[in-house]
Regions:
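Short, charged recognition helix plus adjacent turn
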Residues: 13, 38, 67-80
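A short, Lys/Arg-rich alpha-helix, primarily the initiator
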Residues: 1-20
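Recognition helix of helix-turn-helix/homeodomain-like DNA-binding domains
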Residues: 30-46
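Intrinsically disordered, low-complexity basic tails/linkers immediately adjacent to helix-turn-helix/homeobox/MYB/SANT
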Residues: 57-68
Length: 80
């Protein structure tokens, strides 16, 4: 799995666990909905760390908690 897919999956997982929409996530993260949708729908292939941090802040989790999944542990190498 590549990094952007893991990020997308994690955002969707966290929203599902909290039963919140993408628009609600945008509101609580102080981001425009388009920023999150661009990540989820593949328009943004390299989301900024600050954007992910803002999502984490909105969800009241740390960056460590965001990235602490098997998907991130098993990422394929980006440099080939």
């Amino acid at each position: 799995m590549d990094t952007i897919t893991a990020v997308r999956n994690r955002i969707l997982q966290l929203c599902g666990e909290r039963e919140i929409s993408i628009n609600k996530l945008a509101t609580i993260s102080a981001l425009p909905p388009s920023s999150i949708k661009n990540i989820l729908y593949g328009k943004s292939q390299n989301p900024k760390l600050i954007t992910i941090k803002m999502i984490c802040d909105g969800l009241n989790i740390t960056l460590g908690e965001f990235f602490n999944t098997q998907e991130f542990d098993n990422l394929e190498h980006e440099i080939k």
